[in-house]
Amino acid sequence: EYIKTFNIIREGEPIDAWYLYQADGFYNSYEEIANSVTVGSGVKPGYIRYKNLNNDDKIDNDDRAVCGNLTPSITYAFNFSLGWKGLELSAQFQGVADVKTYLSGNLAAPFWNGAGVLKEWATDAWTPENHNSRLPILHTATGAPEMHDYKNTQWLYDASYLRCKQLQLSY
């Protein structure tokens, strides 16, 4: 077994599988934080909550799990052609499935390297009034707690796609 920062090479798992902490929503109150297993000190409402997978009352490296492929396990392509009275339509498609990508930089951290804030951070970040948000609380790059640097499933997204590589209509 070989563990990198957020990937793992382990027998029986895909090569370079994602090996991450499991995000479990966000803390919504100081009371919830006081009754939870947290990472370090300084945890505030709106911060990412992590699952304690091994139930040892602490969040540590043993709470990471394999949670997706870095490399697609399925690659496919197909084409078709239809003809009618001298008119022909043909297309070629290509895609991949069962692959995950990890967002980083300004997508996962507002104000990254002096950049601005994406619209999603302004509209979809956690606030005391919006506990059902898609993103954690908005913070500056230097104001981010250490626990936000933990590589976790909050920023893991499905990267499967199907694209039309060629579309041709002829007469």
Predicted regions span which residues?
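Conserved small-residue
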Residues: 1-69, 130
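Extracytoplasmic gating/loop element in the C-terminal half of outer-membrane beta-barrel translocons
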Residues: 10-17, 30, 39-45, 96-171
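Glycine- and acidic
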Residues: 61-64, 73-75, 149-156
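Core subunits and conserved enzymes of cellular information-processing
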Residues: 73-75, 81, 143-146
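Structural signature of outer-membrane beta-barrel channels/translocons
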Residues: 81-85, 170
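Outer-membrane beta-barrel pore domains and translocons
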Residues: 83, 94-96
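Repeated loop/turn-to-beta-strand initiation elements of outer-membrane beta-barrel proteins
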Residues: 86-91
